[in-house]
Amino acid sequence: NLAQTKARNSSLEAENTQLKQALKLKKTLTDYTIINGSVISRAADTWSDLLIIDQGSRAGVKKNMPVMAGKGVIGRVVEVNSTTSKVELITTTDKSTNKFAVEADAANGKKVHGVISVVGNNQIAFTQVVDGQKLKKGTRVYTSGMGGLSPKGLLIGTVKKTTRDTFGLSDVVEIQPAGNLNDPSVVSVIKRKVEE
């Protein structure tokens, strides 16, 4: 029927757009090997925490590899099976998770470092920041590579605003994610070309 055809067409157009973004992403990440995959499961009760993709160890996916959708990082592989992998999203509220170490260039030319956390209603921010006030709105935030879990230079998002934490000791820098966290259907798992 016509309604089903229109719905399917709309779904295919959205997937096509995401595939085009994945191709664009591949051109910019020349220092990495990219494993493209599709999201096959995302439960309502863990919507902001986890999703399952259709690529696993057979495709070369390993634990802790970063995952991108659209133009930015959306999470990290936390569990790998032969044909599927579980991805923990950067919006997870799990306090025990490994956080992404990030950096941004301040107006004074220095690097500002922090760790990705979730503040408020699924809003990502980088916290434990000393010089956050020197970051302008729109400044790009990238993975720093510190801690060794993620390669350096993958886009997380852009600075939305900076505030002081409740103790007045450090800054909380809210980030507008570059990645498609709402409803990704196509993802790119990022693998270093030269694996240690």
Please provide the spans of the model-predicted regions:
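Interfacial residues of coiled-coil/leucine-zipper alpha-helices
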Residues: 2, 6-9, 16, 23
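An alpha-helix initiation/capping motif
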Residues: 10-13, 33
